[in-house]
Amino acid sequence: YVFRTQLIRWLDITENRMGKNEYLTDRLNLEAVNFVERNKGKPFFLYLSHYAPHTILNGRPDLVDKYHKKHPSGKSVRRNCYLCQDAGLDIGACTHWAPSHNPHLAAMLESIDDGIGLLAKKLDELGLAENTIFIFSSDNGGENNITSNAPLRGGKSQLYEGGIRVPLIVRWPGGKVPAGQTCDLPVVNHDFYPTLLEALAIKPDPSQTLDGVSTLSTWKTPKIA
């Protein structure tokens, strides 16, 4: 579902742009790429928050079929059986163990990966990559019912690392953020705001109390951190 607000009046969600039975993740990817194209001549901010991967897991049929063929069924203590999903059954009614290789989850992740690639390619094509901060992250760890966060303990809705430790990838070419480097310094999503302010040379509003701190120096020199 896309909830229409004053901020997205321009988005015509009733128009089918990708043919019959368009897939939501693909549509959001398309809208994001089109947004960049429309705003290429001026500063823009794009926040793309995918619904996937989220239960109930439903991947795009052609990708689900791809992953059905790619892996044999495994053993798992995780529920949410994709065989029940394929049969159109209520996931909550499943009482047996699910195979470990869930093609629906894999398919949903591939759709997100494709969208990230499309956005990065569009920025490159328009010559905007060096002047665009591209951040990839997530809101929480994986749900224990459908995946495993091992070797981290716990998962979504838990304060163990499996619930709160998420990916963070920053792409900002032109020597601003070195490619292929990693950093073990713990940061939190609250740090994004002060970090972006510093990156854009904007002074914080003195009336605001910032929960995070700028990590821009860590982005630029991750090895030192």
What does each model-identified segment do?
Residues 1-193, 197-213:
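Active-site-proximal cap/lid insertion segments
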